[in-house]
């Protein structure tokens, strides 16, 4: 029986429930309901299977994973299995009692999202009041417990000018790393693309801000930087290559090669209730479909970067070129490349429409101010 090397990491999307409503959320448009979430036994089994395969890292995400009362149990189980555990959180749910439980369970790292350094801007983007002050308190609680902290800052036209402030905030809050990542336009991000797309000038300014900070700060702060695909000439290796290093588990227990894979019609996604993780990883239809290079069109087959970018993003190829098996339109060899560049420039130059907030109860567009939750 043929096998492939195991994934390096597994992302556990424990829930799609979340206090925030960010318009660029990587969750699918069709959010899983509470009643659809896999139970504790299912997640424990998943961790056991991952460890047996040789997976090294377990990333607990959502939605907001701290809304799951069994999160400390799952973190403890990961620790007992020898898996490195990382929490990806909004920092506005759970509070210090939950953080104490997670530390006791063996949690090893925290990634905290930050929408903006401006309080009003942060609330507008998150669709949640007083978000920045709550995140500040959460970051302080994380550092007080000696846990390593990374800030995740998603960049777009509404906050691009404040990238220097976000880097300064990471230092102020005691983070060891910040990821400055331009919005990736899948799912909710694609739906809100016209509201989020930065201009080329804004992108250039963020590049300067990051490079300047890297030179001045040295080893004080690690800065990861992700540019927006729409202004690129070469595709990035999505998730390190389709079904190469990463596996995503949805709240329902579906096993996915990436966050947005369910947007590709015609692929069969297996569920942990029906097949083992190893069987799905090694032999599942969805994983085999775009793994490696055999699937690539002729122009990709002859490219010297074919085993570097692995053909780019399949979900983006479908969304922008209409075919998941064709060139990623980010690639300058794609016939669709000039069109997506023109789309980005046109949308960035136009007035930003209201956000369509990530809300399961109201998937249609809503006015920005009307959608902000009153959580006080």
Curated annotation (Swiss-Prot):
Role: Catalyzes the cross-linking of a glutamate residue and a tyrosine residue in the PqqA protein as part of the biosynthesis of pyrroloquinoline quinone (PQQ).
What this protein is called in its record is: PqqA peptide cyclase
Reactions catalysed, as given in the entry:
[PQQ precursor protein] + S-adenosyl-L-methionine = E-Y cross-linked-[PQQ precursor protein] + 5'-deoxyadenosine + L-methionine + H(+)
Q: What cofactor does this protein call for?
A: [4Fe-4S] cluster
What is a biological process (GO) this protein takes part in?
pyrroloquinoline quinone biosynthetic process
Question: Is this entry keyworded Kinase?
Answer: no
- Where in this chain does the record put each Radical SAM core domain? 4-219
* Keyword Metal-binding (UniProt): yes
Quaternary state and partners of this protein? Interacts with PqqD. The interaction is necessary for activity of PqqE.
Where, by residue number, does [4Fe-4S] cluster bind?
Answer: 18, 22, 25
